From Swiss-Prot:
NCBIfam families membership: pdxJ, PRK05265.1-4
Designated name of the protein: Pyridoxine 5'-phosphate synthase
Active site location: 44, 76, 198
Signal peptide interval: none
Keyword Transferase: yes
Length: 246
C-alpha cells in the first residue's frame, strides 16, 4: 500500500494569522483536503500560537469525527507538559514528538535517541498508555534506530529537509535519499514503522516512495500549500496522492 498523505495545516494557519480575521479557515481547508482524498490532517501547535492556535484543535477533531471518521489527526510538537495536556485533551490518533526549541521557525533536526532516551521513554510510555500511536522525529541515521525502538515508540518520522533542499542538485539528492533509505531499512529491522516529512514535493516524493516502498505516511504542508495556490487544494491533494503512488 502506498504511503498515506497527511496534510499539514500550519502554513494555512500562518496565512490566516497575518490578519485578525477568520480566513482562510484552517478547518475549512482541512475539509477540502480530506474530501479530495487526503488520509489525515497534521498540526504543530507551538507555544506562541504563531500558526496553529489551540482553538483550532477541537474544530479539527470534530471535523474528522463528524465528517471523515476514517481519517487521522496527527499532532506534533515538543513534549512539554502543556503540549502533552493538549494531546490528552484533543485525542489525536498519532502524536509526533519533535525536539524543537520554541523559538525555531520550523523543525530542522531529529532526536538524539541515545542522549534523549531518559526524556523520551517515560513520555512515550505515558502516551502509549493513553492509547496514542507515537512517532519520533528522526534524522537520517541508521545507527539510532535500536535506541528509537527502545523508547517504546511505534514509528519514526524521517526528517526529509536536507533531501528537499537538494532540489537543484540531483547527485546530492540521490545521496541523501540513500541515507534516508538506509535509515528506514534499519527502522524496519528494529520493528518500527516509518513516516516522513519536511520539504516534500510532487517532484521528490516518487523517488522517496520507490526507495522506501513500505513508507507508512508522509506529512506535507509547505510544498502542498504552495502548489494549492496554483492548482487549488483539491487538485493539489490529487497530485500528491499520485506522487505517493495512489
Amino acid at each position: 500500500m502506498p504511503a498515506k498523505l497527511s496534510v499539514n495545516l500550519n502554513a494555512i494557519a500562518m496565512l490566516r494569522n497575518r490578519r485578525d480575521l477568520p480566513w482562510p479557515s484552517v478547518t475549512g481547508i482541512g475539509r477540502l483536503a480530506l474530501a479530495a482524498g487526503a488520509h489525515g490532517l497534521t498540526v504543530h501547535p507551538r507555544p506562541d500560537e504563531r500558526h496553529t492556535r489551540h482553538s483550532d484543535l477541537p474544530e479539527i477533531r470534530a471535523l474528522i469525527d463528524d465528517e471523515f471518521p476514517q481519517a487521522e489527526f496527527n499532532i506534533e510538537g515538543y513534549p512539554s507538559e502543556d503540549f502533552l495536556a493538549l494531546v490528552e485533551k484533543h485525542q489525536p490518533e498519532q502524536v509526533t514528538l519533535v525536539p524543537d526549541d520554541p523559538a525555531q521557525a520550523t523543525s530542522d533536526h531529529g532526536w538524539n535517541f541515545v542522549a534523549d532516551a531518559a526524556l523520551l521513554t517515560p513520555i512515550v510510555r505515558r502516551l502509549k498508555k493513553g492509547g496514542f500511536r507515537v512517532s519520533l522525529f528522526s534524522d537520517a541515521d541508521p545507527a539510532g534506530m535500536t535506541a528509537a525502538r527502545d523508547t517504546g515508540a511505534d514509528r519514526i518520522e524521517l526528517y526529509t529537509g536536507p533531501y528537499g533542499s537538494y532540489h537543484s542538485d540531483s547527485a546530492k539528492a540521490d545521496k541523501e535519499l540513500e541515507r534516508l533509505g538506509k535509515t528506514a531499512d534499519a527502522a524496519f529491522a528494529a520493528g518500527l514503522q516509518v513516516n516522513a516529512g519536511h520539504d516534500l514535493t510532487v517532484g521528490n516524493l516518487p523517488a522517496l516512495a520507490k526507495r522506501i516502498p513500505a513508507l507508512a505516511e508522509v506529512s506535507i504542508g509547505h510544498g502542498l500549500t504552495a502548489d494549492a495556490l496554483e492548482y487549488g487544494m483539491a487538485g493539489t491533494v490529487g497530485r500528491f496522492l499520485r506522487a505517493c503512488g495512489w
